[in-house]
């Protein structure tokens, strides 16, 4: 029989004291005696120890899972903060770039016009030399 009595001597003492005072029925005393016999039995004690060890391992695993979850949440919050900072910096850079945009398009347009003029001149020069 599997039991969860981790301290059989304490269980036995409580029942014996209660029995002396006449507060324990025979069924309870039989149960404690059975617990004690199970505890004295090496195989039964080994099973109880294994169950206790499995429960400890389960608790450790649950704790690690909880810690992992907490860590993941912290990392996600950190990543989100970093993403927000990066988006903000990019937005600020675009604002600064947009302030300069008044001259940039004009300069780009002038460069494009110059390029087209040079292409026309080069084309005319080619036609003169071949023609």
Swiss-Prot record:
GO terms for molecular function: toxin activity. The keyword Cytoplasm does not apply. The keyword Signal applies. Residues 1-22 form the signal peptide. RLWRNWE repeats lie at residues 34-40, 61-67, 86-92, 107-113. It comes from the Eukaryota. The modification Pyrrolidone carboxylic acid is found at residue 95. Its main location: secreted. Belongs to the scoloptoxin-08 family. This is U-scoloptoxin-Er5e. It comes from Ethmostigmus rubripes.
């Amino acid at each position: 029989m599997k039991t969860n009595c981790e301290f059989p001597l304490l269980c036995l003492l409580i029942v014996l004291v209660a029995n002396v005072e006449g507060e324990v029925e025979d069924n309870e005393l039989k149960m404690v005696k059975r617990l004690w016999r199970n505890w004295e039995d090496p195989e039964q004690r080994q099973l109880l120890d294994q169950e206790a060890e499995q429960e400890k391992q389960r608790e450790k695993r649950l704790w690690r899972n909880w810690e992992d979850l907490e860590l993941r949440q912290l990392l996600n919050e950190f990543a989100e903060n970093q993403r927000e900072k990066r988006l903000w910096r990019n937005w600020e850079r675009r604002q600064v770039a947009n302030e300069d945009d008044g001259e940039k398009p004009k300069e780009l347009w002038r460069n494009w016009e110059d390029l087209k003029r040079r292409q026309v001149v080069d084309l005319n020069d080619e036609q003169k030399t071949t023609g």
